[in-house]
């Protein structure tokens, strides 16, 4: 079994059929270094995988950290959105917002008070997500960014359980 590495894409494969690989495209029997692939010089020239200079490694690490932070932020937002969707459909939230605006314009205090609870609850959830995002953004390592969690148990328990049908009847 041979390890082959694509010289342009840095794809690594284990293969038993070395003759199937063109040596101008693939590095055959490559010794895979212990450093991350983002530190490899691309394209591979010659018979060895070379490491980028420190400045290029630092830039690659900074870009990697940025990507990992954004990925974690996206995961946290998805977690929040799934939790919100588990309680209210998007159309219900939009309709509740419309009813709240309409009630405010016509000074229907009871309806405003009822629907404001939902608006405040959604805002409270947004605050939790934004706080977690802030922790991710201030992280200096990938491990720190990935360690940030979002606990929505108390927030979900505080759901005002608003019904647009009930709001229309007020």
Language model features with spans:
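A preference for well-ordered globular domain cores
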Residues: 1-3, 7-38, 42-170
């Amino acid at each position: 079994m041979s390890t082959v590495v694509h010289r342009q894409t840095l794809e690594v494969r284990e293969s038993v059929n070395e003759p199937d690989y063109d040596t101008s495209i693939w590095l055959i029997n490559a010794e895979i270094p212990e450093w991350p692939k983002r530190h490899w010089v691309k394209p591979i020239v010659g018979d060895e995988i070379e490491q980028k200079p420190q400045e290029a490694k630092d830039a690659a690490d900074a870009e990697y950290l940025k990507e990992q932070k954004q990925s974690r932020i996206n995961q946290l937002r998805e977690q929040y959105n799934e939790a919100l969707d588990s309680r209210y459909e998007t159309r219900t939230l939009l309709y509740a917002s419309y009813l709240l605006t309409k009630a405010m314009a016509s000074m229907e205090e009871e309806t405003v008070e009822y629907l404001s609870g939902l608006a405040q609850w959604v805002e409270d959830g947004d605050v939790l997500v934004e706080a977690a995002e802030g922790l991710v953004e201030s992280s200096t390592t990938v491990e720190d960014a990935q360690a940030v969690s979002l606990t929505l148990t108390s927030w979900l328990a505080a759901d005002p359980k608003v019904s647009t049908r009930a709001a229309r009847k007020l």
